C-alpha cells in the first residue's frame, strides 16, 4: 500500500469537498479510509501504528462532516413540502389553499431530475400551481390579510399580490425571503450611503480594487504595506552624510512643498548603493517614518508571477496603490534582480515586460505637478549590492545615487551601544576599544558579534549540564554581565563579510555614476 497514493486520494477528497462536489469527495474519503485500514494490518511498530490510527480518526471526522453536508443538501432536494409544518399561528386559508393545490400537483408526469428554469428546485410543479391559482382567484387575496405570517407558504400561488404582501410584511419563509431581498437591496444602498461617510471619517482609507483581482490587492496590502515602520534616524548608527542626503531628497519636499517647485522639484527616485549589511533597508524605513508616509517594501518575489501578464499587472497595481495611499515611499530592495540590464542573452521576454512596466510607472511618479497637491507625492527608493548590473534607463530615473559605506569608528561605537542597551555589561568594558578592533565590519557583522558575545555567559553556565539541570537554573544566573573577553572571543568567531576588492568596485562605480 503506497503512502503517496493515500496522500493523493486525501488531497483529491478535500479538493472536491471545497469545490462543492460532495458525492465524489465521499467516494475518495471512503477509499482512503479503506486503504488506511489495510495499511494498519501491515504496521507492527506501536508508535507508527498509533500515528496512522490518529490520521484515520481525523479523516473519519472529515468524512462524517462531508456526509452530513450531503445529507442536508439531499434534504433540500427531496423534501419540497418541508415548510408545511409551520408554527400553529399560521392562518387557516393557507392550509386550504395547499390542499387544493396538492391534487393538481400530481397531474403532470415530470422527470424529477430535470429542473424547470428559472424557478428554484422547490417549485418544480410550477404549472399546476399556476392553474390552481387561476381557478380560485379569491384565495390569493385572503392570505394577504395575515401578511405577517403568510409568505412562508408561497407555493400556493406566486402571483404579484403575494410578492407585494411579502415585501410589505417582511415575513419569513422562501417567498418572504425574496420579498425581503428586494427590501435588502433597497436598504443596502442606504446602508452603503450611511457607511461611506463613516469610512471617510475613519483613520484608514481602503483601496478600491476595481479592475484588479481582489486577492492580488489583499496580498500586496498584507505583505508589502507598512503604515508605521517606527524606525527613526536615532535608531541608525553613523551614516551622517547618507541621512542628510536622504532627508534633503525625500523628507524636505514634504515639509516645504512651496520651495520644491519648478527646477527644485523632488527627485524621481533615490538609489542606495553599498555592501550588504550596511543599513540600506533601515534607512528606507527611517525615511518613511520621518516623513509619515506609507511604506511599500517590495522584493522581486512580490512582483513576479507564473501567469502570463500577471507580473506587469502587479507592478501597475503597486504604483496605483502607492498613489492612493500617498504620500508613499516605495522601497525596492535588491532592485538588480528585477531591473538588470536589458538585451542580455539570459533575459526572458516576461522579465523584459516587467522592466518596461516598471520604467513606465516610475516616469509617472515624478512628483506632484502644478495642479496636484504635494501630499500626492510617491517617492521611489531602491537598494542594491550590484549597481553595475542595473539597467541604464532605470539608473537615469533614479536621479540620486548615494553610497552607503561601512560604519566608521564612531558609527561602530554607536551601533555597539544600540545593540547592547538591554544587555548587562561588566564595569571594565570599553566599547571604543572594541569598536577599533572592528575595522572593516559591516553593521550586520557588528550585530552578530554583539549577539554572540551576549550569550557567552549563558554558555559557560550551562556547560556540562544535562537538560533537566538547565531547566532549573535561575534566570539571574544566566543573565550575567558580558566581559571584554567575551567580545574578543566573539570577534575570533565572527569574521568580516565584505572584502577589500568589493569596496574598490563600489568606489569605482560611484566615481563614474554617483550622484550625491
Swiss-Prot record:
Transmembrane segments: none annotated. It comes from the Eukaryota. Coiled coil: none annotated. ATP binds at residues 274-281. It catalyses: n ATP + n H2O + a microtubule = n ADP + n phosphate + (n+1) alpha/beta tubulin heterodimers. Residues 75-212 are annotated as: Disordered. One of its GO terms (molecular function) is microtubule binding. One of its GO terms (biological process) is microtubule severing. ATPase activity is stimulated by microtubules, which promote homooligomerization. ATP-dependent microtubule severing is stimulated by interaction with KATNB1. CDD domains: Kp60-NTD, RecA-like_KTNA1. It is an enzyme of class 5 (isomerase). Its EC number is 5.6.1.1. Residues 168-178 have a biased composition (Gly residues). It is found in: Cytoplasm; Cytoplasm, Cytoskeleton, Microtubule organizing center, Centrosome; Cytoplasm, Cytoskeleton, Spindle pole. Residues 133-143, 155-167, 179-212 have a biased composition (Basic and acidic residues). Signal peptide: none annotated. Pfam families: AAA, AAA_lid_3, KATNA1_MIT, Vps4_C. One of its GO terms (cellular component) is spindle pole. Keywords: ATP-binding, Cell cycle, Cell division, Cytoplasm, Cytoskeleton, Isomerase, Microtubule, Mitosis, Nucleotide-binding. Can homooligomerize into hexameric rings, which may be promoted by interaction with microtubules. Interacts with KATNB1, which may serve as a targeting subunit. Catalytic subunit of a complex which severs microtubules in an ATP-dependent manner. Microtubule severing may promote rapid reorganization of cellular microtubule arrays and the release of microtubules from the centrosome following nucleation. In mitotic spindles this could allow depolymerization of the microtubule end proximal to the centrosome, and subsequent poleward microtubule flux. Belongs to the AAA ATPase family. Katanin p60 subunit A1 subfamily. This is Katanin p60 ATPase-containing subunit A1. It comes from Strongylocentrotus purpuratus.
Amino acid at each position: 500500500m503506497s503512502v503517496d497514493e493515500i496522500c493523493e486520494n486525501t488531497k483529491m477528497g478535500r479538493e472536491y469537498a471545497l469545490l462543492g462536489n460532495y458525492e465524489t469527495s465521499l467516494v475518495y474519503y471512503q477509499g482512503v479510509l479503506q486503504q488506511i485500514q489495510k495499511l494498519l494490518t501491515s504496521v507492527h511498530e506501536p508508535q507508527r501504528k498509533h500515528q496512522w490510527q490518529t490520521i484515520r480518526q481525523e479523516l473519519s471526522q472529515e468524512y462524517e462532516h462531508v456526509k452530513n453536508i450531503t445529507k442536508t443538501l439531499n434534504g433540500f432536494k427531496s423534501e419540497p413540502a418541508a415548510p408545511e409544518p409551520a408554527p400553529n399561528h399560521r392562518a387557516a386559508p393557507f392550509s386550504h389553499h395547499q390542499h387544493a393545490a396538492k391534487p393538481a400537483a400530481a397531474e403532470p408526469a415530470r422527470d424529477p431530475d430535470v429542473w424547470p428554469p428559472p424557478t428554484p428546485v422547490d417549485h418544480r410543479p410550477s404549472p399546476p400551481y399556476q392553474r390552481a391559482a387561476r381557478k380560485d382567484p379569491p384565495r390569493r387575496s385572503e392570505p394577504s390579510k395575515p401578511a405577517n405570517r403568510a409568505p412562508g407558504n408561497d407555493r400556493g400561488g406566486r402571483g404579484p399580490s403575494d410578492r407585494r404582501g411579502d415585501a410589505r410584511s417582511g415575513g419569513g419563509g422562501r417567498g418572504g425571503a425574496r420579498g425581503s431581498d428586494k427590501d435588502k437591496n433597497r436598504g443596502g444602498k442606504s446602508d452603503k450611503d450611511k457607511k461611506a461617510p463613516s469610512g471617510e471619517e475613519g483613520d484608514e482609507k481602503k483601496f478600491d480594487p476595481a479592475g484588479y483581482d481582489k486577492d492580488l490587492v489583499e496580498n500586496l496590502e498584507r505583505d508589502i504595506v507598512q503604515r508605521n515602520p517606527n524606525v527613526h534616524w536615532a535608531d541608525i548608527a553613523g551614516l551622517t552624510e547618507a541621512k542628510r542626503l536622504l532627508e534633503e531628497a525625500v523628507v524636505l519636499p514634504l515639509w516645504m512643498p512651496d520651495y520644491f517647485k519648478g527646477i527644485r522639484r523632488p527627485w524621481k527616485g533615490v538609489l542606495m548603493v553599498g555592501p550588504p549589511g550596511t543599513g540600506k533597508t533601515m534607512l528606507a524605513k527611517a525615511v518613511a517614518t520621518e516623513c509619515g508616509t506609507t511604506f511599500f517594501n517590495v522584493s522581486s518575489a512580490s512582483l513576479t508571477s507564473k501567469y502570463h501578464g500577471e507580473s506587469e499587472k502587479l507592478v501597475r497595481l503597486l504604483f496605483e496603490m502607492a498613489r492612493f495611499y500617498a504620500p508613499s515611499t516605495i522601497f525596492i530592495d535588491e532592485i538588480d534582480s528585477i531591473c538588470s540590464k536589458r538585451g542580455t542573452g539570459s533575459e526572458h521576454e516576461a522579465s523584459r515586460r516587467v522592466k518596461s512596466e516598471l520604467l513606465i510607472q516610475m516616469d509617472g511618479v515624478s512628483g506632484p505637478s502644478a495642479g496636484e497637491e504635494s501630499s500626492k507625492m510617491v517617492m521611489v527608493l531602491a537598494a542594491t549590492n550590484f549597481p553595475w548590473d542595473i539597467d541604464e534607463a532605470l539608473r537615469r530615473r533614479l536621479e540620486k545615487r548615494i553610497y552607503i559605506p561601512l560604519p566608521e569608528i564612531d558609527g561602530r561605537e554607536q551601533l555597539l551601544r544600540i545593540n547592547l542597551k538591554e544587555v548587562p555589561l561588566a564595569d571594565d568594558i570599553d566599547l571604543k576599544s572594541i569598536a577599533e578592533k572592528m575595522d572593516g565590519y559591516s553593521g550586520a557583522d557588528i550585530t552578530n558579534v554583539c549577539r554572540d558575545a551576549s550569550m557567552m555567559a549563558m554558555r559557560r553556565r550551562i556547560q556540562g549540564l544535562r537538560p533537566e539541570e538547565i531547566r532549573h537554573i535561575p534566570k539571574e544566573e544566566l543573565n550575567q554581565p558580558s566581559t571584554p573577553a567575551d567580545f574578543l572571543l566573539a570577534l575570533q568567531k565572527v569574521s568580516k563579510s565584505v572584502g577589500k576588492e568589493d569596496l574598490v568596485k563600489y568606489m569605482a562605480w560611484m566615481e563614474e555614476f554617483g550622484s550625491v
